């Protein structure tokens, strides 16, 4: 002996009211499972360490006061690039003009 569908729906509706759940007789996807979960934003924000203040940030911040700050790492980098350029091992110079039609016809 089976119970009519309407009677089962009344039972489910009463159960949902009693236990404070959503009544969804058609089984439509509502996203309640995702919405009930805890927010992940704070956990993701604390995953990466906070950024430390570097020499460049200090130069930007206090450059208007006339304070000079030496960035040894950047100075070493610039010296290294100058040495490479002196031996013709550095990056090529950028072109200053737009490519013309004659440049496109050249064989490579």
From Swiss-Prot:
Record's keyword annotation contains Membrane: no
Disulfide bonds listed in the record: none
Cellular component annotations (GO), alphabetically ordered: mitochondrion; ribonucleoprotein complex; ribosome
Main location: mitochondrion
Location(s) in or outside the cell: Mitochondrion
Superkingdom, natural source: Eukaryota
Record region (Disordered): 84-108
Keywords: Mitochondrion, Ribonucleoprotein, Ribosomal protein
Xref: InterPro entries: Ribosomal_mS33
Assembly notes: Component of the mitochondrial small ribosomal subunit (mt-SSU). Mature N.crassa 74S mitochondrial ribosomes consist of a small (37S) and a large (54S) subunit. The 37S small subunit contains a 16S ribosomal RNA (16S mt-rRNA) and 32 different proteins. The 54S large subunit contains a 23S rRNA (23S mt-rRNA) and 42 different proteins.
Function: Component of the mitochondrial ribosome (mitoribosome), a dedicated translation machinery responsible for the synthesis of mitochondrial genome-encoded proteins, including at least some of the essential transmembrane subunits of the mitochondrial respiratory chain. The mitoribosomes are attached to the mitochondrial inner membrane and translation products are cotranslationally integrated into the membrane.
Family the UniProt entry places it in: Belongs to the mitochondrion-specific ribosomal protein mS33 family.
Protein name from the UniProt record: Small ribosomal subunit protein mS33
Organism, as annotated: Neurospora crassa (strain ATCC 24698 / 74-OR23-1A / CBS 708.71 / DSM 1257 / FGSC 987)
